[in-house]
A protein has these predicted regions:
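Alpha-helical scaffold segments
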Residues: 1-242
Length: 242
């Protein structure tokens, strides 16, 4: 994800891009954005831009400062606290942002999830980073969890981790069970078979796709009810004899 392109300004520049001074009071949004496209911009210049209250009214400028490879860490972290929810999402997805800054943006976003609207959570579930989508798999609203399963950044490992959580909601288990892509993965099926919320009919179907040598281990660690386990064990024995 990249910051919106801004056409270069025709007005005279108020900056000395590689000098020791910067008249940040005269900096306009277009000039600042043009300057921040320079990958070799000095950290001191970026910090001066970040101290201009007029410039910081522009979300594009804030995002450009945070995403610049030479922005001092303390400047980026301070600006993160000023961002709106979906701007935090954008920072977490910026390929040019430092890893620790992206993680800080994710942390800030995750901390806000309980206070954002259902509509915002639905949008975040599909569009956010994999780490945020993982948290939204555990949302109390089934629609949010279902939407998170469509996130292109969500991985098999994150889904298995969510399913293995003792507090995994029934609606998450059911959504994964019926998801065309994820329910076909063998490791995900194994995780589903360890959940007490998997429907017995699907448990029987999925167990047949699991290699015989690992079925017993899955049943031993499964949280399924005792009668369901017994039924699957009998099915397993029957399959082995057959």
């Amino acid at each position: 994800m990249t910051i919106d392109e801004i056409p270069p300004t025709d007005s005279p520049s108020s900056f000395e891009t590689h000098g020791d001074t910067l008249d940040s009071e005269l900096a306009g949004e277009d000039q600042a954005l043009s300057l921040l496209k320079q990958t070799d911009l000095r950290a001191q210049t970026i910090e001066e831009l970040s101290k201009n209250p007029a410039l910081l009214k522009s979300r594009k400028v804030k995002l450009a400062i945070i995403g610049h490879p030479r922005t001092p860490r303390h400047v980026s972290l301070a600006l993160l606290r000023q961002l709106f929810t979906f701007d935090l999402m954008q920072v977490a997805l910026l390929p040019v942002a430092a890893g620790d800054i992206k993680k800080a943006a994710e942390d800030a976003l995750i901390n806000r999830l309980e206070s954002v609207t259902l509509g915002e959570r639905l949008s975040l579930a599909r569009r956010s980073s994999g780490r945020v989508a993982f948290v939204l798999l555990c949302d109390k609203e089934s629609r949010v969890a279902t939407e998170a399963l469509e996130n292109p950044r969500l991985t098999e490992g994150l889904i298995i981790r969510a399913l293995n959580d003792d507090d995994a909601a029934p609606h998450l288990v059911h959504a994964v069970c019926h998801h065309l892509k994820w329910s076909a993965r063998r490791e995900i099926r194994a995780a589903l078979l360890r959940s007490e919320h998997i429907p017995l009919s699907l448990a029987v179907e999925f167990m047949r796709e699991i290699p015989t040598e690992v079925r017993d281990e899955i049943l031993r660690s499964s949280r399924l009810a005792a009668d369901a386990k017994a039924y699957l064990q009998n099915e397993n024995l029957s399959a082995s004899r057959g």
